A protein has these predicted regions:
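Electropositive phosphate-/nucleotide-binding environments in soluble metabolic enzymes
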Residues: 10, 38-41, 86-94, 111, ...
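Glycine-enriched alpha-helix->loop->beta-strand junction motifs that scaffold or abut catalytic
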Residues: 18-25, 51-54, 101-103, 124-129, ...
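Short catalytic-loop micro-motif centered on adjacent basic/acidic residues
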Residues: 1-2, 106-111
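Active-site loop ensemble at the mouth of alpha/beta enzyme cores that anchors a bound cofactor
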Residues: 72-76, 126-130, 134-173, 185-208
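Binuclear metal-ion centers of metallo-dependent hydrolases, dominated by the metallo-beta-lactamase
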Residues: 110-120, 124
């Protein structure tokens, strides 16, 4: 399991080195499901400085998320990738790579979604690893939102085919390090709420293997 990083516990992370069952530190650079968030660069820097394990990062830029909230359209899940833009993702990923390299620490970028991240991370493979999810390799906008509505809502979001194609380029050229599930199921009654009150995420653990084998 991951240990959740916060601004308040950043100074204590070195003590986790021998913690049994802890595979790494989880850092939310952008707000998602739940209330874990380390958004400020000084706090992110402190997490990496004190971490004795790999830091796995939900990589979205909180400042851009907040600035883009005005782009959310009530009842229209198509606005989800407009709010949580590709700029939001690559801005955060560049910052995480810079901080990890500064401290010579290992970072794992979770569930990347953009062509910009594929191109950037292909040039920063040292201590930086990253994953792609089956859902981002299977469906893309706008069709996914047309057909599935809020069932296709996740963070970071499903994007258009240009991003989908570049993610597959990464897989075919062995640029990504792993396939990750980003397992985040919700009750049907909640997923069917009107956007943006619907929660982000979908199941992944039980579907990762058959979906990827089918590809």
């Amino acid at each position: 399991f991951y240990f959740g990083a916060t601004a308040d516990n950043a100074n204590d992370l070195a003590s986790l080195k021998g913690l049994e069952g802890c595979c790494g530190i989880k850092l939310f650079a952008g707000s998602s499901t739940g209330n874990l968030l380390v958004a400020e660069e000084d706090d992110i820097d402190k997490v990496f400085q004190n971490s004795s394990k790999v830091v796995a990062v939900h990589s979205e830029d909180e400042a851009i998320l907040n600035a883009n909230k005005k782009l959310i359209k009530d009842g229209d899940v198509h606005s989800h990738p407009v709010w949580r833009s590709s700029e939001c993702a690559i801005s955060s990923t560049r910052r995480i790579a810079r901080i990890a390299e500064r401290h010579n620490k290992k970072a794992h970028i979770l569930h990347i979604t953009t062509k910009e991240e594929i191109d950037f991370l292909s040039q920063h493979k040292g201590n930086i690893t990253f994953e792609i999810t089956p859902q981002h390799l299977t469906i893309y906008a706008p069709d996914c939102y047309d057909k599935l509505g809020t069932y296709a809502q996740m963070n970071p979001p499903l994007r258009d085919k240009s991003h989908y194609d570049r993610l597959w380029y990464g897989v075919r050229n062995n640029i990504n390090d792993t396939i990750g599930s980003d397992h985040a199921p919700h009750l049907k009654v909640n997923k069917e709420k009107s956007y943006p009150n619907s929660p982000s995420g979908m199941p992944g653990v039980q579907t990762l293997m058959p979906v990827m084998l089918n590809h």
